[in-house]
UniProtKB/Swiss-Prot annotation:
HAMAP family on file: RutA
Species for this entry: Escherichia coli (strain ATCC 8739 / DSM 1576 / NBRC 3972 / NCIMB 8545 / WDCM 00012 / Crooks)
Molecular function per GO: alkanesulfonate monooxygenase activity; uracil oxygenase activity
Known function: The FMN-N(5)-oxide reacts spontaneously with NADH to produce FMN. Requires the flavin reductase RutF to regenerate FMN in vivo.
Name of the protein in question: Pyrimidine monooxygenase RutA
EC number: 1.14.99.46
NCBIfam families found in the cross-reference section: RutA (TIGR03612)
Amino acid sequence: MKIGVFVPIGNNGWLISTHAPQYMPTFELNKAIVQKAEHYHFDFALSMIKLRGFGGKTEFWDHNLESFTLMAGLAAVTSRIQIYATAATLTLPPAIVARMAATIDSISGGRFGVNLVTGWQKPEYEQMGIWPGDDYFSRRYDYLTEYVQVLRDLWGTGKSDFKGDFFTMNDCRVSPQPSVPMKVICAGQSDAGMAFSAQYADFNFCFGKGVNTPTAFAPTAARMKQAAEQTGRDVGSYVLFMVIADETDDAARAKWEHYKAGADEEALSWLTEQSQKDTRSGTDTNVRQMADPTSAVNINMGTLVGSYASVARMLDEVASVPGAEGVLLTFDDFLSGIETFGERIQPLMQCRAHLPVLTQEVA
């Protein structure tokens, strides 16, 4: 099973709590995180894109770096780990993304790929005057389908004459082209999103579900497998989890309860409000899960809380789910979390038994 790190491009990572570590996103922090992840044989690093935060006492995600420029920098200071940036497709023409991706392919030596997102948080785009109207909620995957067709033209042949409802290319050129086939990933959880991933993505991200229920996402992975069978493609699921680990189950649980007790209710209210704006995409979208009050303090990603041995066992359970090809991990404290993962958790995982046991990286 592949292991990736979801780097904290926004302040405070993925914990919406006054009791969680409070920090600003910087290149130096993310450089340290990704280099440490590479040392411990993580397979990939991904950054999201966020253009407006949730506010509240913690100013959650009010402070964000930009994904492509961050990952270009990280590509230059790593050598093995795969690097993925996220394109907010309403903000960037596909021909520009094609050229930026080809550039980072050159920087990384063929280790780069692109995560495509349609955009769900209306204020991110409204503040710039580029929100296309609420009809977009029901047409966003039509838009993304044309977008990726332009990308594939340009990466594959260096030229596009695509004509569609959203994009018109007139002998559009991009050169140099990527040195290897460019990976495209997506995070579709709705039926429309999964249909898109089945047709165009190399793999699909989905949320884990619940606390210490590592296989609860299995129905989502099964839906992705079924969608891919319709297109005759192999599109695996990569599952998002937060790891909160300590020497004992009780110590880890105490940390989790402490974070929940400090939940930033004002920021969470903003998230709930935004999740209700899309009335056209159905009830199975990512943002609906993010805003569920059950565990909104970490946007309801699957959460693995326990001793190092318990977390290793649960991750092996994740690997046993049909269609699950990898996990994307976040941590309550990224630097110490990756270190303890690499030294105390990964060596206990059967699905990572092929890797050497490593000790702390020497600076």
